[in-house]
């Protein structure tokens, strides 16, 4: 090696010889496996940044790190019951449709409420929906949709409801250990390879279970084995932390939730964000923009008053949010400024940093 370093001509010749050898190998690889089987990373879509789907909240988009849910990836959203998991996915569907995209909802729980989806901005006339009978059926439908290349977002609700065919055919008391975990492992191995080529984003909603006999550490775990944890590029933990009251203490108008990015392969992980989900309305876009604007000093908060320059928006958070709801042009302008500040900062590096 030292001789090669001492002689630049030898080093250059060695480099050229190795490049010729790689080129011959590339030709053979493309002959056997098809064009594009081996390319330099700078020539591939992987090396050109990560496309994303907005979550509907600029605060959550910031926490994820790439402006929303990454395309061509597997995403897991998990948490306790009634914490807002389905609401997050429906808002993502609404954002996809708003931008002219196509979304599909695989309703394994058979519990999707069309009225609620419509209230969150989902165009139910354009939403593709499937209510499969078995887990195998659900995951095969997802695979077909991904292979089609025509769907931007697929939501599977939920992993816990993906019941294997053998379990359905068996008796109620039969022991079926590991069936669902094997089903998920096999399906995800197939799905992962084709996702990036189709640029489809697939979101799995998952539930929490308690591990029996755990004395130390967190006894909570998600259903469906470990495969989804490994294959997911993004895992979001959603928890309800408080209730939001209206005009009186008995008037509960929504829930305050905390979302933690527990795994992230497209940006730094472990970020947290708190959002408000209003009953029948979902996550308030205006409330997220207000909080982000205060954070980046586009809106000033003095005591309980919110102001923007010389203009007062209102006293108290709810009045300031109401102002932004009415003044759509102001809200759009604030969002545009925030996205430039957060996502177009040249100092931010969104290369893959996570590990499996």
Swiss-Prot record:
Keyword terms of this UniProt record: ATP-binding, Cytoplasm, DNA damage, DNA recombination, DNA repair, DNA-binding, Nucleotide-binding, SOS response
Reply yes or no: does the keyword DNA-binding apply: yes
Name one molecular function that GO assigns to this entry. ATP binding
For this protein, the record's SUPFAM superfamilies field holds: P-loop containing nucleoside triphosphate hydrolases, RecA protein, C-terminal domain
Matching entries from Pfam families are given as: RecA (PF00154), RecA_C (PF21096)
This protein's GO CC annotations: cytosol
| Single GO BP term | DNA recombination
InterPro entries, from UniProt?
AAA+_ATPase (IPR003593), DNA_recomb/repair_RecA (IPR013765), DNA_recomb/repair_RecA_CS (IPR020584), P-loop_NTPase (IPR027417), RecA-like_C (IPR049261), RecA-like_N (IPR049428), RecA_ATP-bd (IPR020588), RecA_C_sf (IPR023400)
- Chain sites annotated for binding ATP: 79-86
Domain of life here? Bacteria
Where in or outside the cell it occurs: the entry states: Cytoplasm
Q: Which family does it belong to?
A: Belongs to the RecA family.
* Known function: Can catalyze the hydrolysis of ATP in the presence of single-stranded DNA, the ATP-dependent uptake of single-stranded DNA by duplex DNA, and the ATP-dependent hybridization of homologous single-stranded DNAs. It interacts with LexA causing its activation and leading to its autocatalytic cleavage.
- Listed name of the protein: Protein RecA
């Amino acid at each position: 090696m030292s001789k090669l370093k001492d002689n630049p001509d030898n080093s250059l010749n060695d480099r050229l010889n190795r490049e010729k050898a790689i080129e011959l190998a590339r030709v053979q690889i493309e002959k056997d496996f098809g064009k594009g089987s081996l390319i330099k990373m700078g020539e591939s879509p992987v090396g050109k940044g990560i496309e994303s789907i907005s979550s509907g909240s600029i605060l959550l988009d910031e926490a994820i790190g790439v402006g929303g849910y990454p395309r061509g990836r597997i995403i897991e959203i998990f948490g306790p019951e009634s914490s807002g998991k389905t609401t997050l996915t429906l808002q993502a569907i609404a954002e996809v449709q708003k931008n002219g995209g196509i979304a599909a909802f695989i309703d394994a729980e058979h519990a999707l409420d069309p009225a609620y989806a419509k209230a969150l901005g989902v165009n139910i006339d354009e939403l593709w929906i499937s209510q499969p009978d078995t887990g195998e059926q659900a995951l095969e439908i997802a695979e077909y949709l991904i292979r089609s290349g025509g769907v931007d977002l697929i939501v599977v609700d939920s992993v816990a409801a993906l019941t294997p065919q053998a379990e359905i055919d068996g008796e109620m008391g039969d022991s079926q250990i590991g069936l669902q975990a094997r089903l998920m492992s096999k399906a995800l191995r197939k799905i992962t390879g084709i996702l990036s080529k189709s640029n489809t984003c697939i979101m799995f909603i998952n539930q929490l279970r308690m591990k029996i006999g755990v004395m130390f550490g967190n006894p909570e775990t998600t259903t469906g084995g470990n495969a989804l944890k490994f294959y997911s590029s993004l895992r979001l933990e959603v928890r309800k932390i408080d209730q939001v009251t209206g005009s009186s203490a008995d008037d509960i108008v929504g829930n305050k939730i905390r979302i933690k990015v527990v795994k992230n392969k497209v940006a730094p992980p472990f970020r947290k964000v708190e959002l408000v989900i209003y009953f029948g309305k979902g996550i308030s876009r205006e409330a997220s923009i207000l909080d982000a604007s205060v954070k980046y000093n586009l809106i000033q908060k003095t005591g309980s008053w919110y102001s923007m320059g010389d203009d007062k928006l209102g006293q108290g958070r709810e009045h300031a949010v109401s102002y932004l709801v009415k003044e759509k042009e102001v809200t759009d302008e604030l969002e545009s400024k925030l996205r430039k500040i957060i996502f177009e900062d040249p100092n931010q590096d969104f290369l893959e940093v996570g590990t499996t």
